[in-house]
Amino acid sequence: MPVIEQVGAREILDSRGNPTVEVEVVLIDGTFARAAVPSGASTGEYEAVELRDGDGRYGGKGVKRAVDAVLDEIGPVVIGLNANDQRLIDQELLDLDGTPDKSRLGGNAILGVSLAVAKAAADSAELPLFRYIGGSNAHILPVPMMNILNGGAHADTAVDVQEFMVAPIGAPSFVEALRWGAEVYHALKSVLKKKGLSTGLGDEGGFAPEVAGTTAALDLVTLAIEAAGFKPGADVALALDAAATEFYTDGIGYHFEGMTHTADQMTEFYADLLGSYPLVSIEDPLSEDDWDGWAALTASIGEQVQIVGDDIFATNPERLEEGIGRGVANALLVKVNQIGTLTETLEAVALAHHSGYRTMISHRSGETEDTMIADLVVALGSGQIKTGAPARSERVAKYNQLLRIEEELGDAARYAGDLAFLRYVVETR
């Protein structure tokens, strides 16, 4: 029986130079596993609370309190438990914390332990993590949703939309999809240079030029797709993450591209984009608290494009259930650190799939070399992963892990491709 023997933790740095938590678990059979916790830049109000120190170290962003929570409180509770009992262990963590938002021990402390336990159990069983979580039928490789042009909170520019993504839906395999995305990425750099625009990078490895607005950015990405030799829509589609909570003011509206808009006006804006660009997915088009606006937007354009709920759902089964009942969105963005345990993440995905919602597994802007989400997306058969541009090692680490998984699966591997968005695929611009 793979009993937990030791639990350790330390403060490490994420890709933005901010501290985060790393947890190590050792089992009685000698198995060792490590998990590092990511952190977001545009964080929703309903996410699990990260425990930060608030002192003079790292501008108050140190995580020694979370590390101490692992060492002093969580470790003694989980030591002696069977690492295979993931649900039991995660429930012990929730009970120990005792708050609805994990604010006592910190979602960063709790998640680190939850993920490290799962990794250790998989290693003890001599199974790859995707197989341990997903079972023998896990075989779907995801479409990489590559954020190749950054705006919003991910870049120091006036571009309001946070992410402009390319989705290589026409590729025959993941290895080819990765190549296509990388070639478009490099083509975009050339396009930007020719136009005298900056090729500096944002938090997630995408370029962060100062451009006039959303349509100008989409035009640049479309030019890059064509310059790389691909057909916009049929080969490589487009996707957005508006992160609209970031430009919404309660009681005033959406301050977007120099004007104040209502939810209905934002919906009209997105509808116009759908008529001009091969968009297959729009994430967080409205604010996290604008339930009525979301429902109206989904009713208006939800048959034409995937509408992904991130901040509004926060990977929380209870919020997702409310959204399903109100006709909000048709897809769930999945971020393990939003909810804080592996078990709750799996519950949210199961609810989404059971309700006909698609899922997209996502990184955070503050990432580490941890590749867990690459295994998770295959385990869950989500068919979509968002983990940044094909640049910067904390992003590429996930893509490289997916290459290994595809190779390990061999002939059993299937690339999701346009099936991930079939009802929304647009052949031409």
Swiss-Prot record:
The keyword Magnesium applies. The keyword Nucleotide-binding does not apply. Its cofactor is Mg(2+). It is an enzyme of class 4 (lyase). It catalyses: (2R)-2-phosphoglycerate = phosphoenolpyruvate + H2O. Pathway: Carbohydrate degradation; glycolysis; pyruvate from D-glyceraldehyde 3-phosphate: step 4/5. Catalyzes the reversible conversion of 2-phosphoglycerate (2-PG) into phosphoenolpyruvate (PEP). It is essential for the degradation of carbohydrates via glycolysis. NCBIfam families: eno. Belongs to the enolase family. This is Enolase. It comes from Mycobacterium leprae (strain TN). The gene is eno.
